[in-house]
């Protein structure tokens, strides 16, 4: 093999982003051949899913932008419940809170159901082993992973969106040897890496607050992940230490 070309687990989130950018370029390049003759249907699905996995972040970011623009427009919109023609019957806006609730619950199911099923499986094993410690570690581990993944998701949303734009603009990521052993990351370097995330987080928070404090609460998971991108990135390079003994149900 080419020296240093093999892939391994990156030691911190900055190196994850570097690897992710390289993988994104490879997967998005497949869009050029996914429609070519000679591929099986499953092969097309496989290539399409690989490319889509790096486009989803951009779609998520775009949906947030569109949602905030609509919220800003809604705050300045003066409703009119009557047409220009004279009528005694108002035209009420169509609002379907039931559909919104169903969509919200479906989203929660997609995000949390796999975690819940995994936790239930571990609790079942803990009960069979009569191990309170196993059950406690499993529960703490799921809670820790849920919070940490919530904070990391907005970070990757920004980096993957920027990466996709760079790829479509023709910018090559190259293939440098991956850092595997030394995961050290200074707090300064972490904050420098996260400066764009922090700026976007502050801007989103300010706009959301201007529209409605309720909107800021609704967007709190995204805003928190962006504003805390620096400290969270720094934490990914720190050793887990004693915490790993109480947060991971490993065997």
PLM feature spans:
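C-terminal amphipathic alpha-helical interaction region
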Residues: 179, 187-251
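Membrane-helix boundary/interface segments in integral membrane proteins
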Residues: 163-188
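Transmembrane alpha-helical segments in integral membrane proteins
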Residues: 109-125, 160-167, 206-213
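Non-transmembrane catalytic domains and loops of membrane-associated enzymes and transporters
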Residues: 1-142, 146, 150, 238-251
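Hydrophobic, aromatic-rich membrane-embedded alpha-helical segments
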Residues: 146-164
């Amino acid at each position: 093999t080419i020296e240093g070309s093999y892939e391994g687990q990156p030691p911190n989130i900055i190196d994850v982003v570097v690897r992710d950018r390289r993988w994104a370029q490879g997967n998005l390049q497949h869009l050029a051949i996914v429609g070519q003759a000679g591929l099986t249907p499953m092969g097309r699905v496989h290539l399409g899913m690989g490319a889509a996995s790096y486009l989803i972040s951009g779609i998520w970011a775009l949906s947030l932008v569109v949602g905030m623009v609509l919220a800003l427009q809604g705050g300045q919109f003066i409703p009119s419940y009557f047409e220009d023609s004279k009528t005694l019957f108002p035209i009420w806006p169509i609002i379907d809170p039931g559909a919104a609730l169903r969509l919200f619950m479906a989203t929660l199911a997609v995000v949390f159901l796999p975690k819940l099923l995994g936790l239930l499986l571990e609790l079942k094993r803990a009960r069979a082993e009569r191990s309170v410690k196993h059950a406690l570690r499993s529960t703490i581990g799921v809670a820790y992973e849920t919070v940490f993944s919530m904070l990391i998701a907005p970070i990757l949303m920004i980096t993957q969106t920027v990466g996709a734009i760079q790829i479509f603009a023709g910018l090559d990521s190259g293939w440098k040897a991956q850092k595997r052993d030394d995961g050290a990351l200074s707090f300064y370097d972490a904050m420098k890496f996260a400066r764009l995330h922090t700026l976007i987080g502050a801007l989103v928070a300010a706009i959301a607050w201007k529209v409605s404090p309720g909107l800021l609460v609704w967007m709190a998971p995204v805003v928190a992940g962006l504003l805390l991108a620096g400290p969270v990135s720094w934490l990914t390079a720190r050793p887990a230490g004693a915490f790993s003994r109480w947060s991971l149900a490993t065997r």
